[in-house]
Amino acid sequence: MSVGMTQGRVRVDISAEVLKENYKKICASVAPLGVISVLKANAYGLGVSAIAKLLVQEGTSAVAVAELAEAMAIVDLPCTKLILGTLLPDEVEEAIANGFHIPLCDYEQAEQFDAVAKRLGCKALCHIALDTGMSRVGFDANNCTSDLLRCAKLSNIELVGMFSHFPQAYEGDEGSLAQIELYKQVLAVLEANGIILEWRHIANSDAINNLPEACRAPFSHVRTGINLYGSFDIIGKRALDLKPVLSIKTRLGQVRMVKAGSTIGYGRTYTCPRDMLVGVVAAGYADGLPLALSNRGSLLINGVPCPVLGRVCMDYTMVSLEQVPTAKAGDEVVCIGKSGAHSITIEDWANLKSTHPYEVLCAIGSRAVRNLV
């Protein structure tokens, strides 16, 4: 299944079989809890349409996205669609009209949801957004129960779930455990007042690997995003045996001999110490190759790591071909993935950038062709 065009210099191949296996392993690790597949930011840059369709076929409990526009991109999928990010006022009607599960962040928002749903002749299906320590969006878990009980009395509000989020689940620390306790306290008040929520979730990918307390009752579901693709946060445990789903490949655009003393690329950051065989790779930072590869990283050609020479350009990257003198224009270049005995991972790039894999995935450029294969 193709996510984009079938032709392009830079190709992102996502293995459907590995994606399915990762999903099944995640499901098995948290059973009997259900799994919500988080596919925000165009499935972390990998192409939401095809990936969402595959995961729905595999039985995901829901697909979660960050905003209304992302939900509309999958509106026809036969599954529960959850928006995690707070709605802007002018997005409310479309979200409710399409039956999306939407986040409820404060009482004033509940009043708006109720009025819109009443006008539309339907219910607003709400997941309470509970701030237990992220200080981002939602009801303050320390002072919210009276407002939540007021929300429950609004005739066109249906409270179907409640979720929260960890700022540091990869540590599995006391702060994260305290967040779980806060959630449980609010849940207990709701249940004591006859409010039973079908969707109760706090665990993200980091929590699945580091916080078993977030992956059992009273919670009903977990949310997973980056683990689906076989990637993990740089910090924390990797409890699940997941495999990378993607490769990024391009081709050599030109092979040339560059004389000793010549400089390579913008800023003249590399000077050839001798006559050198140099390859011009048809991919650059516009395609997602980090600038941090400049004079530090390598790409794989014919199974051989080829050091990046000079600064990564927008459209091209120059590499040394001294270890692959038979390389020619058109040869495959592996940016992420395996070639021969060597491999380069998303985590390798994240380490070079001093960032996390999420940023690396989301930085893959729009002109790179995504293919679910």
Give the role of each language-model region:
Residues 27:
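N-terminal nucleotide-binding beta1-loop-alpha1 segment
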Residues 2-20, 69, 87-89, 106-112, ...:
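Active-site anion/phosphate-binding pocket segments in diverse small-molecule metabolic enzymes
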Residues 6, 10-14, 18-20, 31-201, ...:
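Active-site-proximal beta-alpha core segment in soluble small-molecule metabolic enzymes
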Residues 22-24:
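Alpha-helical scaffold segments that flank or form the walls of functional sites
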